[in-house]
Amino acid sequence: MRTYSPKPGDIQREWLVIDATDVVLGRLAVQTANLLRGKHKAIFAPHVDTGDFVIIVNAEKVALSGDKATTKMAYRHSGYPGGLTATPIGEILEKDARKAIEKAVWGMLPKNKLGRQMLKKLKVYSGPNHPHQAQKATPFEIKQISQ
């Protein structure tokens, strides 16, 4: 018997909406990356994009555990000598929480063409509203552990 390999026509994509209110950033990123990759499906294959579309609302209400708001840094480099810039995650969350969530999810996806294609299926919004009502997104609940 031959191993099944999913074809692009076999993949049924869903739209899922996640409310990020009081959800720890890392747990949110792990669940979102798994949904974008399609690891929750029986037809998952690492070389095929089998994932779903994910909408994250209330991005500004995401939580950080411990004192990560001040100690965890996001690094950028300009390409010039001495061009390394370190910014605390808490500062990025205050400025634009959508960027912080996208950066956390991108860190958990493959760094290739397939990963970039998966990241395009992620839609992050700061408020409770999103412009994807026509897709009839089903709510996805992230199981929380008390902090």
Swiss-Prot record:
Which Gene3D superfamilies does this chain map to?
Ribosomal protein L13
What is one Gene Ontology biological process annotated in the Swiss-Prot or TrEMBL record? negative regulation of translation
Q: Which CDD domains match?
A: Ribosomal_L13 (cd00392)
InterPro entries the UniProt entry points to: Ribosomal_uL13 (IPR005822), Ribosomal_uL13_bac-type (IPR005823), Ribosomal_uL13_sf (IPR036899)
Highest taxon listed in the record's lineage = Bacteria
GO molecular function terms here? mRNA binding; structural constituent of ribosome
Q: Which UniProt keywords apply?
A: Ribonucleoprotein, Ribosomal protein
Q: Which Pfam families match?
A: Ribosomal_L13
Give a Gene Ontology cellular component term annotated to this protein: cytosolic large ribosomal subunit
Q: Sum up the protein's function in the record's words.
A: This protein is one of the early assembly proteins of the 50S ribosomal subunit, although it is not seen to bind rRNA by itself. It is important during the early stages of 50S assembly.
Oligomeric state and interaction partners are given as: Part of the 50S ribosomal subunit.
- Hey, which family's this protein in? Belongs to the universal ribosomal protein uL13 family.
Write the protein's name. Large ribosomal subunit protein uL13
This chain's source organism reads: Nocardioides sp. (strain ATCC BAA-499 / JS614)
| Gene designation per UniProt | rplM
